[in-house]
């Protein structure tokens, strides 16, 4: 059945750039777009049915490169002061500490988040999941839950098992602390590589894996170098990291070296065409 969506404003592609077609029309048949233009055009096919989208924007799917893929948790985080539950208690560093969400919680969160993304017009997204559920790396179920939800609901997803070398927590006196553990970071990196293998072998054209050392300030030079080595061994697979996001991070860096933060990354080989540095404010 040939269907017309009558705008509204249609975002089209003309002369190598996007353009806005006021009262434009989109004609599709099955999963094929047959025409984008104006209804009076002689090349406009006659539709079997018409969807009235007057007053609305008709656009190709948006690409959300830095998507907080935990809308359920993130809204709670924004609505409440950080002193009310944001800081991790000291038990998170205990052996075999469990995340605040179980596997079913992650699946429900993934369904809600991917559905919300699609509802807002985001058909492709690069996921960033909340730090509230993390210690040194993701819970095992989290990226797989997002992958399953994305495939079932029809979103194109770039996903990763996140990892880092430092875990922040608050001690019993309310003082912020940070504990480093290279072995836990390596475990997280190994799981990230396993997830990339899973994505590559899934047969899905919409599922992509990448490497995500969660924050450069919580990673040693050695971990960042190993990340780049693994990226190169996988054909320069995409790498991203939170970088130079807060003034405290910048001050801690300058206390150690006179190099700028970008110069530091350049000196350890953590720059390249496959790398995306998130924020990069200082």
Name each model-derived stretch.
Residues 1-45, 54-57:
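N-terminal metal-binding scaffold of metallo-dependent hydrolase/deaminase domains
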Residues 8, 26, 31, 55, ...:
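Divalent metal-coordination and catalytic microenvironments
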Residues 13, 38, 50, 112, ...:
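A generic local structural motif
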Residues 13, 68, 130, 280-281:
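Flexible loop residues that form catalytic
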Residues 77-156, 188-204:
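Alpha-helical scaffold segments that flank or form the walls of functional sites
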Residues 136-281:
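Metal-coordinating catalytic core of metallo-dependent amide/deamination hydrolases
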């Amino acid at each position: 059945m040939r269907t017309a969506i009558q705008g509204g404003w249609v975002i089209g592609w003309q002369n190598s750039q996007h353009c806005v077609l006021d009262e434009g029309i989109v004609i599709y048949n099955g999963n094929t777009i047959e025409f984008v233009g104006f209804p009076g055009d002689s090349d406009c096919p006659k539709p079997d049915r018409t969807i009235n989208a007057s007053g609305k924007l008709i656009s190709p799917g948006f690409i959300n490169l830095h998507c907080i893929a935990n809308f359920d948790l993130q809204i709670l985080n924004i609505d409440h002061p950080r002193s009310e539950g944001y800081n991790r208690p000291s038990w998170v560093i205990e052996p075999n500490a469990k995340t605040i969400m179980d596997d079913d919680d992650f699946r429900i969160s993934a369904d809600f988040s991917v559905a919300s993304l699609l509802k807002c017009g985001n058909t492709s997204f690069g996921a960033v999941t909340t730090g509230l559920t993390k210690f040194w790396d993701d819970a095992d179920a989290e990226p797989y839950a997002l992958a399953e939800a994305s495939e079932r609901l029809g979103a194109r997803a770039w996903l990763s098992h996140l990892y880092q070398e430092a875990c922040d927590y608050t001690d019993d006196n309310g003082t912020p602390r940070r504990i480093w553990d290279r072995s836990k970071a390596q475990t997280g990196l190994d799981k990230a590589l396993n997830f990339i293998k899973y994505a590559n072998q899934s047969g899905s054209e919409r599922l992509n894996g990448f490497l995500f050392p969660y924050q450069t300030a919580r990673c040693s030079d050695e971990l960042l170098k190993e990340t780049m080595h693994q990226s190169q061994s996988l054909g320069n697979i995409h790498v991203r990291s939170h970088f130079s996001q807060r003034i405290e991070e910048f001050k801690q860096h300058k206390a150690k070296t006179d190099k700028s933060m970008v110069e530091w990354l350049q000196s350890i080989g953590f720059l390249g065409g496959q790398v995306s540095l998130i924020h990069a404010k200082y």
